[in-house]
Amino acid sequence: MTEIVDIIAREILDSRGNPTVEVDVILEDGAFGRAAVPSGASTGAHEANEKRDGDKARYLGKGVQQAVDAVNGEIFDALSGVDAEDQRRVDNLMIELDGTPNKARLGANAILGVSLATAKAAAESAGLPLYKYVGGVNARVLPTPMMNIINGGAHADNPIDIQEFMILPTGAKDFREGLRMGAEIFHALKKALKDAGHNTNVGDEGGFAPNLASAEAALDFIVKAGEKAGYKAGDDFVLGLDVASTEFFKNGKYELEGEGKSLDPAAMVDYLAGLVAKFPILTIEDGMAEDDFDGWKLLTDTLGKKVQLVGDDLFVTNPKRLQMGLDKGLANSILVKVNQIGTLSETIDAVELAHRHGYTSVMSHRSGETEDSTIADLAVALNCGQIKTGSLARSDRTAKYNQLLRIQEMLDDQGVYAGRAALKGR
């Protein structure tokens, strides 16, 4: 009854106006699953391959018709009649069919769309919400949100070098209250920026992109906005950074052009340690470049006991890259982006490997998103304890927060808010 009888892919638009892949999977019993695939702006070199057509006469070369055709053609042929409840078999069949180490032939965007839509169809067939179908009875931890409220780097047209400045409402009693705290700080920040003469347009992920001279200026604005909203930084909420340092690592130096600094890896570690000393920053993502392993080791040895150090470009949700990091003692947390690896099964493997070794995990969106809220369910299903899905503006971001509100309602008194515990004693 749960055999796959139809798979339909189409080209839709993401939140940046670029095409992406959406997939419908239909089972023999009539159950239906739909998934839309996200896309990143700052991408790691070791990510699975997102297939784009390259035809400049169509969508400026960013079309995904080849990926759509792969789903409607060879992927459907390979999966027709396969049991959707056997997720690992579905995923492995697509990996084998692709035949490349990074899913370059069919495209990770094609494969992921089918993988997630299959899980959603199987969940519907079982009469379960996705978080419970994937995670079972232990899926009850509502994640602490990392809310990206000031954007810089590749996510904004401003001089700020660091890509994301985030708040984490760790002092909230539940997810609903944490979301409210975030929204109130967001609006207080908007007023503070406006009063100071800055623009309050929002970037790709819904955060503000003011022309501030330094990371310290951005952090200062956020702390003061929190106070205006009635919350104390360090108690009610803490701060997080996504440095995205691979983006400005050139010839062995970290080129902070906005701040006029050219730093070697040791100086970059000192720079980040200086920010941590001045502000209640408890999580830093991609503090060093993806292949600067010596820099990562120094950062981990310097800050790893008191700050969550998240590997995004470093690990690209890949169990093999994560194992390398575990062996070398790099970072202490993994960012989880389903489209970096390209299947649900491999995503689960990466999270489980991280948790087995005491690393934390953060479920994440991409800068190019859709209304699809699958990652909200997966954050709960995989007991990530943290989710990073943008600011408190733009429906492509709030779709995930709103789904978590629904999940909190479904879990009722069984649900637990991760809060500060998600940061493992930091």
UniProtKB/Swiss-Prot annotation:
Catalytic activity: (2R)-2-phosphoglycerate = phosphoenolpyruvate + H2O
Keyword Membrane: no
Active site: E205, K337
Cofactor note (record): Binds a second Mg(2+) ion via substrate during catalysis.
Pathway(s) this gene product operates in, as recorded in its UniProt entry: Carbohydrate degradation; glycolysis; pyruvate from D-glyceraldehyde 3-phosphate: step 4/5
Binding site for (2R)-2-phosphoglycerate: Q163, K337, R366, S367, K388
GO CC, one annotated term: cell surface
Keyword Secreted: yes
CDD domains, alphabetized: enolase
E.C. number: 4.2.1.11
Keyword annotations: Cytoplasm, Glycolysis, Lyase, Magnesium, Metal-binding, Secreted
GO biological process: glycolytic process
Annotated residues for binding of Mg(2+): D242, E285, D312
UniProt subcellular location: Cytoplasm; Secreted; Cell surface
Cited SUPFAM superfamilies: Enolase C-terminal domain-like, Enolase N-terminal domain-like
Role, per record: Catalyzes the reversible conversion of 2-phosphoglycerate (2-PG) into phosphoenolpyruvate (PEP). It is essential for the degradation of carbohydrates via glycolysis.
Family: Belongs to the enolase family.
The protein, known as: Enolase
